[in-house]
Amino acid sequence: MESAAEVIRDGKAVLGIEFGSTRIKAVLVDGKCKPIASGSHEWENRLEHGYWTYSLEDIWAGLQDAYKNLKEDVREKYQQPLKRLGALGFSGMMHGYMAFDAEGKLLVPFRTWRNTTTGEAAAALTKAFDFNIPQRWSIAHLYQAMLNGEPHVKEISFLTTLAGFLHWKLTGEKRMGVGEASGMFPIGRGSCAYDKEMVHKFDSLAAEMGYSWTLEQILPQPVPAGTPAGVLTPEGAALLDPSGDLQPGIPLAPCEGDAGTGMTATNAVRLGTGNVSAGTSDFAMLVTDREMAVHREIDMVTTPSGIPVAMVHCNNCTSDINAWVSLFEEFAEAIGAPQEPGKLYTLLFRKALEGSPDGGGLVSCNFYSGEPVLGLNQGRPLMVRSPDSQLNLGNFMRTHLLSALAALKIGLDILTRQEKVELTKLYAHGGFFKTKGVGQRIMAAAADVPVS
């Protein structure tokens, strides 16, 4: 069996890069999918001119820094450069809106999944398609821009997501995994292509409004996992590794979204399996072939191979918790006892298990941004208590952990109680579950099933 150093030297290591909401992660694995090196970059979205966004400069600087840190990890562990790879793949925050003209120029700043500015469009398309179109989906962003009469829309030549953008720039290919594509526009049942009837309806709406493009012309081509999706071009290699060490010609997998990577990481891609991801946002996904009524709280996406998935997605999970932990961190520094963030999170999460089952009468509303599941267009985080509430650290933390999953529970209850989707176990991942046993227990209480 080859050592990790030999795998890297022989160009057989595989690199995956994921763009999360707060961290860009680059992980190198060997032939048995064992991590052998990693690098990361911290970043954060900004609210600019009414939209949550990351700039192109943020994207490229973050990608290059995460990759640079990976290279340094490889050199430190294995005393050799990283020049060749066996394969490469991207994943990222799904949905959102990155619109480009025929010259490849970004027409408006990137509008992320977090924006809740597309309510009118989402409602209209849901009615027209008889299929739930959430506010964060790319097609809702596009139609809202059309309804707003935004002048850039007529110039659109390509519309994609963050992962789709990165894949395009590094390969020249306008293709993406079907799971990622299912968060842009509905996928036809039993196919790995956009739903033809819905495409026709949307193209008719666009034509009536005077637009000359069609969805087939501007959307990426969906492909299932395992389909060749291009190779790293010399220009792409220079974008990823400006030092010039990385050689082009590396095959790329179809880019996927964070939903698809979550399903794969938890091995929840077969019918009847389910997983939950909880971090900046949280979402639960159940692989099911059931025909369901239209619910605004339930999204229908697909696995990376195109199997239908019922998803409950909530914009808000840990952002409010993160803000409070930062406050405690600042206090610790002020009294001369600074704490590492990781240790502080562990301490505070464990305190939650000491709290009363009802949080001592405390109430937290964790809406850092809008929450479409509850019909909220803007976020206003709140911490509320009555004079006779029991305010202590255990109750405080327990309340915030329970609040982080409250909106998710509403959607899960619709799936299990109204739609009778069988849920027997959930596989969990994400920052909410880093402290052993804490987030897992809170999630099990919310979903009323075992969580592992």
Predicted regions and their residues:
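N-terminal glycine/serine-rich phosphate-binding loop of ATP-dependent small-molecule kinases
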Residues: 1-108, 123-124, 155, 216, ...
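Active-site core segments that coordinate phosphate-bearing ligands/cofactors
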Residues: 2-11, 15-16, 120-176, 185-202, ...
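Anionic group-transfer/hydrolysis microenvironments
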Residues: 20, 27, 103, 222, ...
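Core alpha/beta catalytic barrel or barrel-like domain that forms the active/cofactor pocket
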Residues: 36-37, 210-226
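Generic structural signal for well-ordered secondary structure
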Residues: 52, 56, 60-63, 90, ...
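Short beta-strand-loop/turn "lid" adjacent to the catalytic site in phosphate-handling enzymes
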Residues: 75-112, 132-134, 167-188, 219-232
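Carbohydrate-associated surface elements
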Residues: 115
